[in-house]
From Swiss-Prot:
Keywords tagged on the record: Cytoplasmic vesicle, Disulfide bond, Fertilization, Metal-binding, Secreted, Signal
Region forming the signal peptide: 1-19
Originating species: Mus musculus
Gene this chain is encoded by: Prss37
Name assigned to this protein: Probable inactive serine protease 37
Tissue expression: Testis-specific. Expressed in spermatids. Weakly expressed in mature sperm (at protein level).
Transmembrane segments: none
PROSITE patterns: TRYPSIN_DOM (PS50240)
GO biological process, one term: regulation of protein processing
Species classification: Eukaryota, Metazoa, Chordata, Craniata, Vertebrata
Gene Ontology CC entries for this record: acrosomal vesicle; extracellular region
Residues annotated as domain Peptidase S1: 20-233
One function term, GO molecular function aspect: metal ion binding
Length: 237
């Protein structure tokens, strides 16, 4: 089932208001997938496992957890290399709705107030549920290519009908659709609203590369729970 989320993006930046101080939101489950290519965001679902979009399978990938600010260290920073990356078996450029992969970490993450797991949704989300769009953005002092600020935005889940009216929504199955009231002007805007969290569980991860405009597509995690659980249990050793 496709669902659509309507949200308001404040003018100027993706998720950040025009204030002198930017507040970092609480999202300790976010993992930054750092590479020499485009930025990507995943979610720590178990101590040794990160769930992420399959298109984030990039050379020289490193998983960053904890504090993401390069200029300020607080002891929560962790960089862990993957030892195995497992793409969803049906993923291809012609089947972008299956844009998921599991990353097994070389060692378990060390939990702290900025590093925590997020359970995955085992039921579908009902229309009208207010969910959180959680991702990474660039702080005002950050002129680099890597995001460093956790940001959250609330938005209600809408029905499948509106999603079907959009070109993006009608061409994806197992999807949640997001309609942005204002378009993104920033390159790599997808990392700012990379995940959908409903009732404190991971419900969606962005599909494909965000190409601008007012529609975002998310993989509905609920449809992939059997594959996620089977894979993470089989690969424990």
């Amino acid at each position: 089932m496709k669902l659509i989320i309507y949200l308001t993006i404040l003018a100027g930046t993706a998720l950040v208001t025009h204030s002198s101080v930017q507040k970092e939101d609480h999202a300790p489950y976010l993992a930054y997938l750092k590479s020499n290519f485009n930025p990507c965001v995943g979610v720590l679902i178990k101590a040794s496992w990160v769930l992420a979009p399959s298109h984030c399978y990039l050379p020289n990938l490193r998983v960053m957890l904890g504090n993401f600010k390069s200029r300020v260290r607080d002891g929560t920073e962790q960089t862990i290399y993957p030892i195995q990356i497992i793409r969803y078996w049906n993923y291809s450029h012609t089947a972008p709705q299956d844009d998921l992969m599991l990353i097994k970490l070389a060692k378990p993450a060390t939990f702290n107030h900025k590093v925590q797991v997020l359970p995955i949704a085992t039921t579908n989300v009902r229309p009208g549920t207010v969910c959180t769009l959680s991702g990474l953005d660039w702080s005002q002092e950050n002129n680099g290519r890597h995001p460093d600020l956790r940001q959250n935005l609330e938005a209600p889940v809408m029905t499948d009908k509106d999603c079907q009216k959009t070109q993006q929504g009608s061409s994806h199955r197992n999807s949640l659709c997001v309609r942005f009231v204002k378009v993104f002007s920033r390159i790599f805007g997808e990392v700012a609203v990379a995940t959908v969290i409903c009732k404190n569980k991971l419900q969606g991860i962005e599909v494909g590369h965000f190409m601008g405009g007012d529609v975002g597509i998310y993989t509905n995690i609920y449809s992939y729970v059997p594959w996620i659980e089977k894979t993470t249990k089989e690969k424990m050793t």
